[in-house]
């Protein structure tokens, strides 16, 4: 029963004032709200805003530094690629020069070997010709000697010596 009495009393109070009463409580509530807003602004919103601004500045600085580093890295990579390409061209030039030099040396050695072989062939041919001439001269002497011996045996030694 006491519940019903309390409920009826609350309904009576609510019917009188409506949403809120326009008495001294309204300006007091407004002052309390403004004080709460000032206190929250000083203790919560300003430090939180500073922290957020600091974080934004930190992120922005990190992004700028990262972009600068990326730009430097790209420039270094490009310079490295150019240097590498130059080194490759230089290496190809050195290899081509070395191959040309090796071919030149090989051609010179082949020509020298052919010249030496030709000289040895000519020397051998000369020696063969000389030995041939010596053999022919020796053979002629032997033929003359044998012919004389045959003539001496056939005709006699006295007739052959007279000739």
From Swiss-Prot:
Keyword Ion transport assigned: yes
Cellular component, GO annotation: plasma membrane-derived thylakoid membrane; proton-transporting ATP synthase complex
Similarity section: Belongs to the ATPase B chain family.
Superkingdom, taxonomy of origin: Bacteria
Membrane topology: Single-pass membrane protein
Gene responsible for this protein: atpF2
Name of the protein in question: ATP synthase subunit b'
CDD domains reported in the protein's UniProt record: ATP-synt_Fo_b
């Amino acid at each position: 029963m006491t519940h019903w009495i309390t409920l009826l009393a609350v309904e009576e109070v609510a019917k009188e004032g409506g949403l809120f009463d326009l008495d001294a409580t309204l300006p007091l509530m407004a002052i309390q709200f403004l004080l709460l807003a000032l206190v929250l602004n000083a203790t919560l919103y300003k430090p939180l805003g500073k922290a957020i601004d600091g974080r934004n500045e930190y992120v922005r600085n990190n992004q700028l530094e990262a972009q600068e580093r990326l730009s430097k890295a790209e420039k270094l990579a490009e310079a490295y690629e150019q240097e590498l390409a130059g080194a490759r061209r230089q290496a190809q030039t050195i290899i081509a020069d070395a191959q040309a030099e090796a071919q030149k040396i090989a051609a010179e050695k082949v020509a020298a070997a052919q010249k030496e072989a030709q000289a040895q062939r000519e020397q051998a041919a000369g020696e063969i010709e000389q030995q041939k001439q010596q053999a022919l001269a020796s053979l002629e002497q032997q033929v003359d000697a044998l012919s004389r011996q045959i003539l001496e045996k056939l005709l006699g030694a006295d007739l052959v010596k007279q000739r």
